Amino acid sequence: MVIPSTFWLGLGYFTYFFSFGIFLPFWAAWLKGEGIEPSMIGILLGVGLVARFIGSLIISPRVKDPSKLIKALRLLSLLALIFAVGFVFGSHWLWLFFVMVGFNLFFSPLVPLSDALAGTWQKQFTFDYGKVRVWGSIAFIISSALTGILMSANGINFSISSLDIGWSMSFDSLNGWIGKEVFGTHHIILAFLIFSITVMLLGMMLKPAVMPVGKEKTTNTNTVSFKELLSEKSVWQFLVCVTLLQAAHAGYYSFGTIYWENAGYSPSTIGYLWSLGVMAEVLVFTFSKQLFRRWSARNLLLLSGICGVIRWGLMGISTELPVLIIIQILHCGTFTVCHLAAMRFIGARKENEIIRLQATYSALAMGGGIAVMSVIAGFMYEHISNGIFWVMALVALPALFLRPKVEAHTH
């Protein structure tokens, strides 16, 4: 079956982030449901993040021929599905360690390779990347909310009172038909994840109307070395700053769901809270040009740091719903504004520095820093519970003073 190329790309983003909207907010809850201790949950999530970093940094750049991008995406989707199914076959920490590494290793390169495909297609025909990419964020919002509902509800009810139409299905009857307690329990997380990745793979198997073409990329001999790049004070200040700001999310990513469950919130409410954070993120990304047209990377990092100290401090103080709503809205400051600052700083560098600096930023801020703090948070959560969010606020605090004082070089 042949479909429009932009539809193929949008479907890929939608199904990937639909899966990620199940995995990121609720995987710690699944591990807890399998009887894993908080300290081991932190280790497993940290190992997964390290594997994501390795997958993005090593696997993605190996696809140098743009015409091979779709084959690579199909293969990685298949491998991710195989490892997702692997979670069914055991809950011993050693087995989970192995499967977490494999799943994240092959799941993580899907977005950078999809972005590379988008860039290739933009050279072949004109389309609005933002309008295609936004379907990923919409999918995350839907799946995180829906997973919470399927975990906590007793069934599905649908009615239109004005037309006297009604329909309902009990989860007890569904579970009885399956022969296992899946719906309304933590088991739905894994089942839903496997289903979503299966749909992603099936979507990848469709044929886009326009296949990607291009010349194989060759190594740029003018690329600056890591040593040369890090010898500049503003660069290492930038990297330390963004790594601290993103690493401060580790407590939230790893234990936010469990913390809110222990505070008495239902999985459906928790799903809505996660969705709210992404909705705020989408709004800021959408209107970033209007909001921050004249902001420097240094000032954006200041705003992100202030939001981080406030957000994580509030999370350690209160679990009242109005406060949690404010906390989740602040996600657009702690994550989105920080990412916008990074893109502004990196985009203003010399051309031969951009690829290496982008890779270093992704490795440290979006991978390594969060991985290390996830492991630390796992050990700390057992002893100080909500105190880990105060620690996260302290992690973000030095970033206020480490912001690069000199603006990045221009092209």
What does each model-identified segment do?
Residues V2-R52, V235-L273, H339:
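Helix-loop boundary and gating motifs at the non-cytosolic
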Residues M1-I3, W177-G179, L206-V242:
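Juxtamembrane intracellular "pre-TM" segments in multi-pass secondary transporters
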Residues I355-H383:
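A late C-terminal transmembrane helix in Major Facilitator Superfamily
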Residues K71-V85, N299-L314:
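Structural signature of the two symmetry-related core transmembrane helices
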